Amino acid sequence: PCVFMDDDGQAYIYNGGGGICKGGKLKDNMMELDGEMKVMEGLVDFHEATWIHKYKGKYYLSYSDNHNDDWNDGVEGDNRMHYAISDSPLGPWKHMGVYMDPTDSATNHGSIVEYKGQWYAFYHNSALSHHDWLRSICVDKLYYNEDGTIRMVEQRK
């Protein structure tokens, strides 16, 4: 799951798998839902690995896709990272495309965070182990275009 804390102090929780992403509000105790979880509408080829962040007043939902029919076969290039944008933390979402190509791992999960004015994309690959099921943590700089779209992340090995 992913927990996102909005600027107004409201917490949201997201989870997903099997092609469905859901999100909902959390109560102040951070232990209970404040209402029902709802399906996040507008995502394209969602698989798993939901992450939410906010940039210039817009909400960004990033996730791993399932574009390969043999997605769990251990072949390089099984999952790309997509993102969608919304005016609300619970959507509806507008799919914007892919911001990261597949790694050499059988899957990819990512997060996007700002640190000291620079945005970063965290993800994993198999560069250290050379086995697609053993994940190595990676981080690269992430950049936005003037219109708020995310540039493709250049993966450095």
Each predicted region: which residue ranges?
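Carbohydrate-active catalytic/glycan-binding domains of CAZyme proteins
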Residues: 1-157
